[in-house]
Curated annotation (Swiss-Prot):
Residues 142-153 have a biased composition (Low complexity). The keyword Coiled coil does not apply. Part of the 50S ribosomal subunit. Forms a cluster with proteins L14 and L19. GO terms for biological process: translation. One of the primary rRNA binding proteins, it binds directly near the 3'-end of the 23S rRNA, where it nucleates assembly of the 50S subunit. GO terms for molecular function: rRNA binding; structural constituent of ribosome. This is Large ribosomal subunit protein uL3. Belongs to the universal ribosomal protein uL3 family.
Length: 217
């Protein structure tokens, strides 16, 4: 499994294809990231590469973290991410990870924290249908029945109800890389990605999950 890269979502825009159709895209400032640690099967029980992204002030880093980061470079980094790999021989501590690791036309999986929408009702949070708006109805956006009475006499866990909407770590898979600007460390991704502008996202090569029986999809 190859490693990914950390970046910052800048916002959305649009590009035009050969036929003149507008294609919505997301701009991501990806990297440069620094390799901060290499984990091996002998010492750690598994092989992994840890990278860091984003500068941090000295007052926000404690002494153990500072000692760990200074082993790979002079700059203190704010965000760390670890990627499992088969072997770490092709990486060295202090190496730079940039957008050059990706290619135009490649599919990627992007993880981030979705935009929080606060306390939301049934219609907005789950897409439930509303009740009649006229003819004397008093059930416009109410939930309706949430379960039986005597049996089971309670609401089962996991029942879809009103509550906090968004603000969770999610992954959007199979997004297409349309353009790469290695001078500005930019990735242009087709479609939307999790998070609001300015949020940190994790971009990694698309992980193809096999179907039942081990067949590739």
């Amino acid at each position: 499994m190859s490693i990914g890269i950390l970046g910052k979502k800048l916002g959305m825009s649009q590009l035009f294809d050969d036929k003149g159709n507008a294609v919505p895209v997301t701009l991501i400032e990806a990297g440069p990231c620094r390799v901060t640690q290499l984990k091996t099967t002998t010492l750690d029980g598994y092989s992994a590469v840890q990278i860091g992204y984003g500068l941090s002030k000295d007052k926000h880093i404690n002494k153990p973290e500072k000692g760990h980061l200074l082993k790979s470079g002079e700059e203190l980094l704010k965000h760390l991410k670890e990627y499992r790999v088969e072997e770490t021989t092709s990486y060295e501590i202090g190496n730079q990870i940039t957008v050059k690791n990706f290619e135009v036309g490649q599919k990627v999986d992007i993880s981030g924290k979705s935009m929080g929408r606060g306390f939301a009702g049934y219609q907005k949070r789950h897409g439930f249908s509303r009740g009649p708006m006229s003819h004397g109805s008093k059930n416009h956006r109410a939930p309706g029945s949430t379960g039986a009475g005597t049996t089971p006499g309670r609401i089962y866990p996991g029942k879809r109800m009103a509550g906090r909407y968004g603000g969770k770590q999610i992954t959007t898979k199979g997004l297409l890389v349309l353009k790469i600007d290695d001078q500005k460390n930019l990735l242009v991704i087709k479609g939307s990605v999790p998070g609001k502008p300015g949020s940190i996202v994790n971009i990694k090569p698309n992980n193809v999950v096999g179907k039942k029986g081990g067949q590739k999809s």
